[in-house]
């Protein structure tokens, strides 16, 4: 049986509201993440990713409320990331209805945290989110470095080596974002995605840079990703989930089309 590729819209949530805007027709409140989630669920998204970018830990309770209300209304799996620093954070998100929890900076700071989380909750619900920038110069072998704290802090850590280490620690999935491409609409960094996907035995989600439906196809066909994440092309109604799935299927990618 061929593993079907997944399309995952991503919503950035700050203080309980969607930021970067969502332009859905017929949505009463496009800033409400639960309304946006319901629209994506109805449109046939395979999964949804919430990224909590709330700056202060005082407002963390809002994301728990968002996840809980989304779980009440939606059937698609939901991954939640942003500010996950402890086993208690993961437990609370899972209890609220998240299917998977994404760990970013905390995994860089303490790789054993990933092992503890996977041991306690199972590999299948632990995603490690990798934000990487290309640091190799022209003519050099490709090399990417991990950045943390929303891409502001270089770590000196090689992204591909780190990805392998995270899977060894128990990550069940990797979310790989190219910081060079993020928001540019110039397509995924295929070299980055493929370099990681070819080295690990877990699903890899390509992220950062989608501008066209061809970019989604390339993420799977050329980048060897098992899932493709996008934000603005769906949020602003450039393409629908249905159009994206049909296009990918027409280009030879196995998709769930029901």
From Swiss-Prot:
The keyword Amino-acid biosynthesis applies. It is an enzyme of class 4 (lyase). It catalyses: 5-[(5-phospho-1-deoxy-D-ribulos-1-ylimino)methylamino]-1-(5-phospho-beta-D-ribosyl)imidazole-4-carboxamide + L-glutamine = D-erythro-1-(imidazol-4-yl)glycerol 3-phosphate + 5-amino-1-(5-phospho-beta-D-ribosyl)imidazole-4-carboxamide + L-glutamate + H(+). Pathway: Amino-acid biosynthesis; L-histidine biosynthesis; L-histidine from 5-phospho-alpha-D-ribose 1-diphosphate: step 5/9. Pfam families: His_biosynth. GO terms for cellular component: cytoplasm. Disulfide bonds: none annotated. One of its GO terms (biological process) is L-histidine biosynthetic process. Its EC number is 4.3.2.10. Gene3D superfamilies: Aldolase class I. One of its GO terms (molecular function) is lyase activity. It comes from the Bacteria. Keywords: Amino-acid biosynthesis, Cytoplasm, Histidine biosynthesis, Lyase. InterPro entries: Aldolase_TIM, His_biosynth, HisF, IGPS_HisA/HisF, RibuloseP-bd_barrel. It is found in: Cytoplasm. The active site is at residues 12, 131. Heterodimer of HisH and HisF. IGPS catalyzes the conversion of PRFAR and glutamine to IGP, AICAR and glutamate. The HisF subunit catalyzes the cyclization activity that produces IGP and AICAR from PRFAR using the ammonia provided by the HisH subunit. Belongs to the HisA/HisF family. This is Imidazole glycerol phosphate synthase subunit HisF. It comes from Agrobacterium fabrum (strain C58 / ATCC 33970). The lineage of its organism: Bacteria, Pseudomonadati, Pseudomonadota, Alphaproteobacteria, Hyphomicrobiales.
